[in-house]
Swiss-Prot record:
One of its GO terms (biological process) is arginine catabolic process to glutamate. Keywords: Arginine metabolism, Hydrolase. It comes from Salmonella newport (strain SL254). The gene is astB. This is N-succinylarginine dihydrolase. It comes from the Bacteria. The lineage of its organism: Bacteria, Pseudomonadati, Pseudomonadota, Gammaproteobacteria, Enterobacterales. The keyword Lipid metabolism does not apply. The keyword Hydrolase applies.
């Protein structure tokens, strides 16, 4: 059956700021306390979406979350009106305010893990929400992510959206950022590669930075998504690269159809994995980048592998890259050599995503890949699909509500909270989502 990959990109939230909340993500740590520009951030993302949609790659949007997230502060014991809580937490525990104001939901590669209908035992598209257990600010996301996905993929005859795994470290799950699918045509059955950083009975794990994904979680997600057991491979990421800042697999590898583009040090038993894939995937091609050409540290600094690998109509592939790759002499030299060689990657497109990149999120972080047949695509909420009208409407919406300068101190401003809620209220109507946010639900804003 004919199917296409649709990229659902996250809209950057109104409270996008640099707080250094994500230990193990070196860009996040390095840019802590810098002044951010939320309006520029959301527009950089929109430009990427529209350019790819105009080039013929189906594109849709996933909205931001409600931030600052007052219900979480109430759970932490802060009382009073919303405004009083903001004032108290800003004075008593500003770190908590930064955490509940994080715009991290924009990186929707961590929203869920997706199984196309061609791979599922019941023939439906499955999405399992990620619990993002390793970081407090991200562990807040799952309930609203689930509500948003149910509002987008609402036809239960075509889609199954599963709640996140229990919030315990043993089941730490980071979503599609640790998941690849390889195969031929999108509509044919593929091989799903689940990548983990640790497992309970295995002492091989990173020493410096946390391994966020457990094998136990990956196995549970594969079961929930009803992935045919004959079409699954579980592989461990190289713990040494996690300790160099590769906090998700999509910082060191990206796949599309029959191609796996990765660093030679990406996986713990890479030769064994490559041989498995060669046996299981017709026409499989591994493009392994040697450390002599691009070091792991340069790959992390430029987000070379946090790129999007997209199939064009002629069978060739386009590599969508952040501008940091073009700015790095060695990485850009390697990329120009790559597209000149005999492989499916024949073109590159560079985008300026510096607002997101400074917090440790490149092109691949900003999108959730969902393979859909034509019938399934028609069943998706049509209001989220990118086109000229939506692009114009979202830019006008951003101009109206987003600030062009934000610091950590601004997060305590009650006006920012009100601006955010008004903006999301308008957005839910624009995208026909219903009342997906806690503040929209009766009594939620009052605790």
């Amino acid at each position: 059956m004919t199917a296409h990959e649709v990229n659902f990109d996250g809209l950057v939230g109104l409270t996008h700021h640099y707080a250094g909340l994500s230990f193990g993500n070196e860009a996040s740590t390095r840019h802590r306390f810098q002044v951010s520009n939320p309006r520029l951030a959301v527009k950089q993302g929109l430009l990427k979406m529209k350019a790819l949609a105009d080039a013929g790659f189906p594109q849709a949007v996933i909205p931001p979350h409600e931030r600052p997230f007052i219900p979480a502060l109430r759970q932490l014991g802060f009382t009073g009106s919303d405004e009083q809580i903001l004032d108290k937490v800003a004075r008593q525990a500003p770190r908590w305010l930064s955490s509940v104001s994080s715009a991290s939901p924009m990186w929707v590669a961590n929203a869920a893990t997706v199984c196309p209908s061609a791979d599922a035992l019941d023939g439906k598209v499955h999405l399992t929400v990620a619990n993002l257990n390793n970081k407090f600010h991200r562990a807040l996301e799952a309930p609203v992510t689930e509500a948003l996905l149910r509002a987008i993929f609402r036809d239960e005859s075509q889609f199954s959206v599963h709640s996140a795994l229990p919030q315990v470290a043993l089941l730490g799950d980071e979503g599609a950022a640790n998941h690849n699918r390889l195969g031929g045509e999108y509509g044919s059955a593929g091989v799903q590669l689940f990548v983990y950083g640790r497992e309970e009975e295995n002492e091989i794990r990173p020493a410096r930075y946390p391994a966020r994904q457990s094998r136990e979680a990956s196995e549970a997600v594969a079961r929930l998504n009803q992935v045919n057991p004959q079409q699954v491979i579980f592989a461990q990421q190289n713990p040494e690269v996690i300790d160099q800042g590769v906090f998700h697999n999509d910082v060191i590898a990206v796949s599309n159809r029959q191609v796996l583009f990765c660093h030679e040090a990406a996986f713990a038993r890479q030769k064994v994995l490559i041989n498995q894939l060669r046996t299981r995937v017709d026409g499989f091609m591994a493009i392994e980048v040697p450390a002599g050409e691009v070091s792991v540290s340069d790959a992390v600094a430029t987000y070379l592998f946090n790129s999007q690998l997209l199939s064009r109509d002629d069978g060739s592939m386009l590599l969508v890259l952040p501008r940091e790759c073009q700015d790095h002499v060695g990485v850009w030299r390697y990329l120009n050599k790559l597209v000149a060689e005999d492989n499916p990657i024949s073109a590159m497109q560079v985008f300026d995503l510096r607002e997101s990149m400074a917090n440790g999120g490149g092109p691949a972080c900003l999108r959730l890949r969902v393979v859909l047949t034509e019938e399934e695509r028609r069943a998706v909420n049509p209001a989220v699909m990118m086109n000229d009208a939506l692009f114009t409407a979202l830019n006008a919406w951003a101009d109206r509500y987003y600030r062009d300068r934000l610091t950590a101190a601004d997060l305590a401003d009650p006006l920012l909270l009100r601006e955010g809620r008004e903006a999301l209220d308008v957005l839910t109507r624009l995208l026909d989502l219903g009342s997906v946010y806690p503040f929209q639900q009766t009594g939620a804003a009052d605790g």
